[in-house]
């Protein structure tokens, strides 16, 4: 629900997609520096960005797992609670990755320590559907909004409670677009899930 003049912080090394979207929504975009060893934003560079620009009301922070390495998520989680921002994981490189928090292993995408996690299904990523992506969240409000936005804002929920309602009957409660993958794309992506462990092992060897 990013609005005009809302503050969003991104790592300076990232794909242009997140910046494009924030710019289209007329948000205020700030870029945090990255660690020279990992290429990733760190809690320290995030705090430095906040201090340098005297930011107070931060709406969202995007962390990007360059090379599939979910670095520092637990420390970003502490900052999320402190500054009350939405934490988004750009896990386009990290499908199948895991991280350790308080001695427990978590899958990237579980969204226990973030609000939203996104994966890419581009041909260069871990698995592909030709194009497209995946959004994960544990936030029910965000989930319901995503469901409405993905299909041109169409909402059939109220009518599904009734019996024998016409299939063409629906409401438009939000402006939305068509974010649905075709059946062919979905079939390709689903078939690649069977190979994901093999793909990850090969990438580890190369790394």
PLM-predicted stretches and their roles:
Residues 93-106, 113-207:
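Active-site region of PLP-dependent enzymes
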Residues 12, 66, 193:
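Conserved donor-binding loops in enzymes that form glycosidic bonds
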């Amino acid at each position: 629900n990013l609005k005009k003049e809302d503050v969003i912080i991104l790592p300076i090394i990232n794909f242009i997609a997140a910046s494009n979207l924030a710019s289209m929504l007329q948000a205020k975009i700030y870029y945090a520096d990255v660690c020279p060893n990992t290429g990733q934003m760190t809690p320290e560079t995030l705090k430095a960005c906040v201090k340098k620009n005297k930011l107070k009301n931060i709406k969202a922070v995007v962390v990007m797992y360059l090379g599939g390495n979910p670095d520092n998520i637990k420390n970003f989680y502490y900052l999320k609670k402190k500054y009350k921002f939405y934490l988004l994981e750009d896990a386009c490189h990290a499908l199948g990755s895991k991280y350790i928090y308080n001695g427990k292993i978590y899958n990237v995408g579980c969204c226990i320590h973030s609000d939203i996690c996104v994966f890419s299904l581009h041909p260069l990523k871990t698995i592909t559907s030709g194009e497209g992506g995946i959004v994960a969240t544990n936030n029910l409000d965000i989930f319901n909004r995503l469901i409405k936005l993905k299909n041109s804002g169409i909402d059939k929920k109220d009518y599904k409670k009734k019996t024998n309602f016409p299939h063409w009957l629906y409401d438009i409660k939000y402006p939305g677009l068509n974010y649905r993958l075709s059946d062919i794309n979905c079939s390709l992506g689903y078939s690649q899930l069977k190979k994901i462990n093999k793909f990850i092992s090969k990438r580890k060897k190369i790394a």
